[in-house]
């Protein structure tokens, strides 16, 4: 009684949360549900004929017409408070205690999906045929692994639980069991057990000798993995907002993989790097820029055998091997030459040119074209900037040389000026000396002319007169006679 009250409360709660839009969608997909009913019968199916009184809620739904359909709300079918325990977890030595089963019946003959909004009718079964079920088949399908509705089969205490030999329903005494249901056009509720092989609709009414499989066969069927779901069935489930557990895990794993790749790929995570790192001169030496063949790890294809001679000068000793080919080079043979050996993976100029040539032939589309054009534009601008900086450095060196030459010329001019000043001073001194000498010569010449005039005017000879001491003028004239002749 407690389980019955719980099922009724659950039906009321589900009826309260019905949505008109979902009803309309389910009504639109009703033909597809009927078409897929044959393909959804996986495994052994058992048909349950309509027995017992009809359910009142189903009668109300049938009276409303085909436009009003119950809503499939799989999230609230089984509350967390209800225990779900497989019957095979029971200890093997414990005698099985069978209880009264519950049969779901429907009045509407048209193919439809039973939902949790339909109430469950408890149909007592006779206890005289206890041999029909030796052990309950406890197959509980997960909520998210089937594309059909589920029926809640409740149990109540009883001594045994059997149905007619031609129709059997898997029942367990541990609690609530969930089975996917399909309703065929002949007023039968088909309880589907997931299995690998797909059986046609004609297998819904098997012969009596083959309807009671053994415990070993049932255990074997339970242990077999489920087959791949039908794509149309999965599409229908996605339209209703239902996904299987495997599909959900696959979606989450793909999402995590995309996130991991987008964050771990250095070719796309370095878009916000500095301009220096995006230059062609910097990313050419980056091994990630090379092709997949050039960047291939040597451990996958074996160790690379490098040449014993330099590829440029054809001589050996102290070679730098290339990380992507068999070539080796001297550090001094490279253009430009290297002073210290590079650390890590080093790529020779030949492989760099090959990678650049191959990269230029790849067409760029979309965002890659924008990024490529931006990088190309920045590269051209950087090259122009480098040229201007180089020209500026050359002009600056020329300016320094001219300044040095100017300083040298200034010092030379200063020395010339000093020499000129000294020469002018010496010239002035010499000129003054010459002026004095000329004055002296004029005096001497005047004195001589005076003596000649006196000699011509006086008839008496000089010896006749008294002897006098010669004057200083005469003495100086005789002294300066030799310098005057020299000049």
From Swiss-Prot:
Disulfide-bonded cysteines: none
UniProt xrefs under Gene3D superfamilies: Zinc/RING finger domain, C3HC4 (zinc finger)
Keywords tagged on the record: Coiled coil, Metal-binding, Zinc, Zinc-finger
Segments forming PHD-type zinc fingers: 307-354
Pfam (any one): PHD
Coiled-coil annotated spans: 380-420
Molecular function via GO: zinc ion binding
Entries under PANTHER family matching the protein: PHD FINGER PROTEIN, PHD FINGER PROTEIN 21B
Name this polypeptide is given: PHD finger protein 21B
């Amino acid at each position: 009684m407690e389980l019955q009250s719980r099922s009724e409360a659950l039906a009321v709660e589900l009826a309260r949360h019905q949505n008109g839009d979902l009803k309309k969608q389910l009504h639109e997909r009703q033909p597809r549900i009927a078409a897929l009913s044959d393909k959804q019968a996986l495994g052994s199916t058992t048909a349950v004929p309509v027995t017992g009184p009809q359910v009142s809620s189903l009668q109300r739904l049938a009276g409303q017409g085909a436009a009003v359909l119950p809503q499939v709300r799989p999230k609230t079918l089984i509350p967390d408070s209800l225990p779900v325990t497989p019957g095979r977890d029971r200890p093997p030595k414990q005698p099985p205690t069978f209880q009264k089963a519950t049969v779901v019946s429907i009045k509407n003959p048209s193919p439809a999906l039973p939902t949790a909004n339909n109430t469950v009718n408890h149909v007592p079964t006779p206890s005289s045929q206890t041999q029909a079920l030796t052990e309950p088949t406890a197959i509980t399908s997960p909520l998210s692994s089937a594309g059909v509705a589920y029926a809640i089969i409740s149990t109540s205490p009883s001594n045994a639980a059997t149905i007619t030999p031609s129709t059997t329903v898997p029942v367990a005494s541990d609690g609530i069991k969930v089975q996917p249901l399909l309703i065929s056009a002949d007023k039968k509720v088909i309880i589907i057990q997931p299995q690998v092989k797909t059986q046609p609709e004609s297998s819904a009414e098997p012969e009596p000798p083959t309807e009671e499989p053994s415990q070993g066969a049932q255990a074997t069927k339970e242990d077999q993995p489920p087959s791949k779901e039908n794509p149309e069935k999965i599409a229908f489930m996605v339209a209703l907002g239902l996904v299987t557990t495997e599909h959900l895990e696959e979606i989450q794993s793909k999402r995590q993989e995309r996130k991991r790749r987008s964050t771990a790929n250095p070719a796309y995570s370095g878009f916000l790097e500095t301009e220096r790192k995006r230059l062609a001169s910097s990313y050419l030496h980056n091994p990630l820029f090379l092709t997949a063949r050039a960047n291939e790890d040597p451990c996958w294809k074996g160790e690379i055998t490098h040449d014993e001679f330099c590829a440029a000068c054809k001589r050996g000793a102290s070679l730098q091997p290339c990380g992507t080919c068999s070539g080796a080079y001297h550090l001094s043979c490279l253009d430009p030459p290297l002073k210290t050996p590079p650390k890590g993976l080093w790529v020779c100029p030949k492989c760099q040119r090959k990678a650049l040539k191959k990269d230029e032939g790849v067409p760029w589309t979309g965002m890659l074209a924008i990024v490529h054009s931006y990088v190309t534009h920045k590269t051209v601008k950087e090259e122009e900037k480098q040229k201007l900086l180089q020209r500026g450095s050359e002009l600056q060196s020329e300016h320094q040389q001219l300044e040095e030459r100017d300083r040298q010329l200034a010092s030379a001019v200063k020395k010339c000026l000093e020499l000129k000043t000294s020469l002018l001073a010496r010239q002035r001194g010499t000129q003054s000396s010459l002026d004095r000498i000329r004055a002296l010569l004029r005096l001497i010449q005047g004195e001589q002319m005076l003596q000649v005039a006196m000699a011509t005017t006086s008839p008496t000879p000089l010896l006749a007169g008294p002897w006098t001491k010669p004057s200083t003028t005469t003495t100086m004239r005789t002294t300066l006679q030799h310098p005057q002749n020299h000049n």
